[in-house]
Each structure stands twice: as structure tokens, then as C-alpha cells.
């Protein structure tokens, strides 16, 4: 029977947080951010396994969090790579071979909802690839190299992409292998498919599905958690 697997990418160092502690290990309400992220997927009935990708020297720390909070479905903890795309590739190689849909998610994005996860799987089964996100609230400007505004895109045509980003496993693995062979750089996994002419369906995420990257995000995260509990 085919599986739905999730790769949690927790290999970032969080330089923008101005902290010696990696952002995924910082705490909200006395629990690490990683706990909230892992628990969202481990308790979701459509998720069969979790592969956690982290810094090599943090594998033991992650294992302790998993044990302390009795988090299920984590099949492997694997070391990350130099860049995020290398970490994702390591995760892709570690998932079960009977995986059909793989979700790739930021460890520092702890407020993903059950509906976002379920819709990602559903749309991937329908279209082969899907990513959640939101329409920007602010007006977006395009500027030239001198710093002057030259265009104002219609906000309805713009999309702030979040995670999870969800894919047919064989498609995303094949594209990552090509990316590695051609030595191309990307900033997220939808770009991996775009590089090879594949389309990604974009569906509604949530403005609360933030990635915690700055001290201000930690404060906002506490407020979001209070509303959710």
C-alpha cells in the first residue's frame, strides 16, 4: 500500500533570530517549536511516516524531543546538507520506497493546520504537485536597479508560498536528481519542478501558517498559539 510521507526540514541555523539556539529548538509556551510541528503531522491520520532532517550535531537533540513528547511516526532522523535543497534531497532518499505523496515542510512553521495537510495530499493526487500559500495583504512593487518603482503587480496574481509543498514522490525525486547533476540552486521545492517544466497547483494556506525566523515572529507565534488553544 502506498504511503504519504512528510520530510520536516530542521537543518537551518536561524541566523536572523540572533540566537545561539537554532530556531526550531526555541520555545513557545515552554515547548520547542519542533515539537509543535512534529505533533501536527504525527497526529494526522493521512500521514504515514515522518523523516526529520537536521544538523548532524542536533540528531541526538531531536531524538530526545521525540522521546520526551512521545511523538509517533518518525521513521528516520537524517543529517542535512550544505544548502536547504541538499537537506531535502537527503530526506527524499530516506523515505520509504512505497511512498507515493511526499510533503516537504519547514520545521519552523509550527501552525500548519490539518486542512492544509489534507488538501495538499488531495491536490497532489489530482495534479502531481501542490503548494499552499496566501495572497499578499500589502501592495507589492517591482523596482529597478536604481531603487525606483517601475511596476505594481495585481495582488490577485501574486502568491506568498508557504509549506507544506507536496509532490508525487517519483517526480520530485527525479527533478532533485537532475538539479544536483546540473548544479542548479533553488530557494524552495516548487522551483525544482519549475526548472524542468512541471506545474505546481497553488492552494489556500493560512496567514497564521508563519515561519518563525525573527524574534518578532516568536512573539506573534505565542499569540497564534493562544488563539488555537
From Swiss-Prot:
One of its GO terms (biological process) is isopentenyl diphosphate biosynthetic process, methylerythritol 4-phosphate pathway. The keyword Cell membrane does not apply. It is an enzyme of class 2 (transferase). It comes from the Bacteria. GO terms for molecular function: 2-C-methyl-D-erythritol 4-phosphate cytidylyltransferase activity. Pathway: Isoprenoid biosynthesis; isopentenyl diphosphate biosynthesis via DXP pathway; isopentenyl diphosphate from 1-deoxy-D-xylulose 5-phosphate: step 2/6. Keywords: Isoprene biosynthesis, Nucleotidyltransferase, Transferase. The record marks 155, 211 as: Positions MEP for the nucleophilic attack. SUPFAM superfamilies: Nucleotide-diphospho-sugar transferases. Its EC number is 2.7.7.60. The record marks 16, 23 as: Transition state stabilizer. It holds the Pfam family IspD. The keyword Transferase applies. Catalyzes the formation of 4-diphosphocytidyl-2-C-methyl-D-erythritol from CTP and 2-C-methyl-D-erythritol 4-phosphate (MEP). Belongs to the IspD/TarI cytidylyltransferase family. IspD subfamily. This is 2-C-methyl-D-erythritol 4-phosphate cytidylyltransferase. It comes from Clostridium botulinum (strain Kyoto / Type A2). The lineage of its organism: Bacteria, Bacillati, Bacillota, Clostridia, Eubacteriales.
Amino acid at each position: 500500500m502506498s504511503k504519504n510521507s512528510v520530510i520536516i526540514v530542521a537543518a537551518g541555523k536561524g541566523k536572523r533570530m540572533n540566537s545561539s539556539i537554532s530556531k526550531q529548538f526555541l520555545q513557545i509556551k515552554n515547548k520547542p517549536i519542533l515539537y509543535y510541528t512534529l505533533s501536527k503531522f504525527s497526529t494526522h491520520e493521512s500521514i504515514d511516516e515522518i523523516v526529520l532532517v537536521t544538523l548532524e550535531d542536533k540528531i541526538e537533540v531531536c531524538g530526545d524531543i521525540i522521546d520526551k513528547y512521545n511523538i509517533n511516526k518518525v521513521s528516520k532522523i537524517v543529517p542535512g546538507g550544505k544548502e536547504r535543497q541538499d537537506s531535502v534531497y537527503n530526506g527524499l532518499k530516506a523515505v520509504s520506497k512505497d511512498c507515493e505523496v511526499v510533503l516537504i515542510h519547514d520545521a519552523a512553521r509550527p501552525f500548519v493546520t490539518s486542512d492544509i495537510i489534507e488538501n495538499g495530499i488531495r491536490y497532489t493526487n489530482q495534479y502531481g504537485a501542490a503548494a499552499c500559500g496566501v495572497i499578499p495583504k500589502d501592495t507589492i512593487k517591482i523596482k529597478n536597479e536604481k531603487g525606483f518603482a517601475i511596476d505594481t503587480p495585481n495582488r490577485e496574481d501574486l502568491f506568498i508560498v508557504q509549506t507544506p509543498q507536496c509532490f508525487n514522490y517519483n517526480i520530485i525525486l527525479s527533478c532533485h536528481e537532475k538539479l544536483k547533476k546540473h548544479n542548479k540552486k533553488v530557494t524552495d521545492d516548487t522551483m525544482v519542478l519549475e526548472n524542468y517544466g512541471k506545474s505546481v497547483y497553488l492552494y489556500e494556506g493560512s496567514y497564521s501558517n508563519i515561519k518563525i525566523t525573527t524574534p518578532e515572529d516568536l512573539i506573534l507565534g505565542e499569540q497564534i498559539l493562544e488563539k488555537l488553544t
